[in-house]
Regions:
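Phosphate/pyrophosphate-binding catalytic cores of soluble transferases and nucleic-acid-acting enzymes
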Residues: 1-316
Length: 316
């Protein structure tokens, strides 16, 4: 990477949901002057605390965090905005002589920060109208299947029920004749951050599923349902808004709407979380991650400490 100005460097710790990223990052912060830059598309929203596993006030008092609680839940927050905000945070942290550590599982954010985003066509009302009409007739899963045919890479990253992203990927293909994933891969490089990415990859999927289940139940015990009730009481939110796409929120919202009982809400939330983890792992398999570490490996904290010191200290 060449540039007339110095390039800010940072380490990114990523991996699927519930794999232990936060715990490992906080262990590192006990041993190095680290500040954490959240790379989580849900933690940016105020009021989404319990269901996003947002660090507590006590933790954030002990270890400074960035890009948490920066927008209201009725606002939109994009990957492009994250890239700008995160780059500014990393440079600020570095300028103060401290160590920036990106932590999170929103992998589109990582790509935007590391590689930049391609210049894509603007939304086209006519194309979107046609896609909406097809979805009403065939259903969004059918359009997801079509996406898998024309852009299998994007389809692997997008849930069959994620209407917004399916529509955008098909719209881009209709307007350009090229897959969205191909356009993203061809985004021009510049002097963005130099990021060393470490992914925690669970070797035991059954154990990960159990951890997801335990974590969801713990969130419920902490007041997750009451948190969603408070969001509903705001009056200007719907479960279709981007903030409420975070796993668990939409399912609990449906329960509070009376669409199904609690057991079904819990089941749907767990299914959605497992599907999220699967999509994250699929993305990581196709991404140029610097290193992949077994999430269950012993001595991860010491290994991570040595790796961070080597990268930020020597440039290796």
């Amino acid at each position: 990477m060449t540039s007339s100005k110095s390039v800010a460097r940072c380490v990114c710790l990523t991996g699927p949901t519930a794999c232990g990223k936060t715990e490992l990052a906080l262990e590192l912060a006990e041993r190095l002057p680290v500040e954490i830059v959240s790379m989580d598309s849900a933690m940016v929203y105020r009021g989404l605390d319990i269901g996003t596993a947002k660090p507590s006030a006590a933790v954030r008092e002990r270890v400074r965090h960035h890009l948490i609680d920066i927008v209201e839940p009725n606002d939109a927050y994009s990957a492009g905005r994250f890239a700008r905000d995160a780059a500014a945070a990393v440079r600020d942290i570095t300028a103060r002589g401290r160590l920036p550590l990106l932590v999170g599982g929103t992998l589109l954010y990582l790509r935007a920060l590391r590689d930049g985003l391609a210049t894509l066509p603007r939304a086209d009302a006519a194309v979107r109208h046609e896609l909406d009409a097809q979805a009403r007739e065939l259903g969004w899963p059918a359009l997801h299947a079509r996406l898998a045919h024309v852009d299998p890479v994007s389809a692997a990253r997008i849930a069959p029920a994620d209407r917004q992203r399916i529509q955008r990927a098909l719209e881009v293909h209709a307007l350009t004749g090229r897959p969205l994933s191909e356009l993203q891969d061809s985004a021009p490089a510049d002097d963005r951050l130099e990021v060393a990415t470490i992914a925690l990859v669970p070797g035991d999927r059954a154990a990960l599923a159990q951890r997801i289940e335990r974590r969801f139940d713990a969130m419920v015990d902490l007041g997750f349902v009451a948190e969603v009730k408070n969001l509903r009481a705001c009056g200007d939110l719907t479960k279709e808004m981007p903030a409420l796409r975070a796993v668990g929120y939409r399912q609990i919202w449906g329960y509070l709407d009376g669409a199904y009982d609690w057991q079904e809400a819990r089941r749907l939330a767990l299914v959605a979380t497992r599907q999220l983890a699967k999509r994250q792992l699929t993305w990581l398999r196709g991404d140029r991650v610097s290193e992949r570490w077994p999430a269950e490996a012993p001595g991860l904290s010491s290994t991570f400490l040595a790796r961070v010191e080597r990268f930020l200290g020597s440039g290796a």
